[in-house]
Amino acid sequence: MNRLGFVFQSAPHSTSKGREGLDAILAASAYSEDIQIFFIGDGVLQLLKNQEPEKILSRDYISGFKMLELYDLEEIFVCQNAMGNRGIKEEYLLIDVDSISNKDINEKLSQCDQIMVF
């Protein structure tokens, strides 16, 4: 089976990319167990706790990231540099992740057979 990589690089709620990415992951997990998920750039903002999207009339899909564990999706990586540049610490995040360097992210992405970017 092919290794699938999902990359989140967009801020939440400004577009539908985050919600569509989460939906794509959950759908793909029915067919593949070899899935890696990456949060880079503004994509790290997708995982922040205590977001209130209803205040800007957006749908709350962020809590859906908690479902990744139920789907046995454990290879979830965030970019250390992106978190540092935005003053984000791991305890601010909604789910457990592995914080890794840009180099490690690039290495892992190079091992994916298919990559989808959101």
UniProtKB/Swiss-Prot annotation:
Belongs to the DsrF/TusC family. It comes from Aliivibrio fischeri (strain ATCC 700601 / ES114) (Vibrio fischeri). This is Protein TusC homolog. It holds the Pfam family DsrE. Keywords: Cytoplasm. It is found in: Cytoplasm. One of its GO terms (cellular component) is cytoplasm. The keyword Cytoplasm applies. Could be part of a sulfur-relay system.
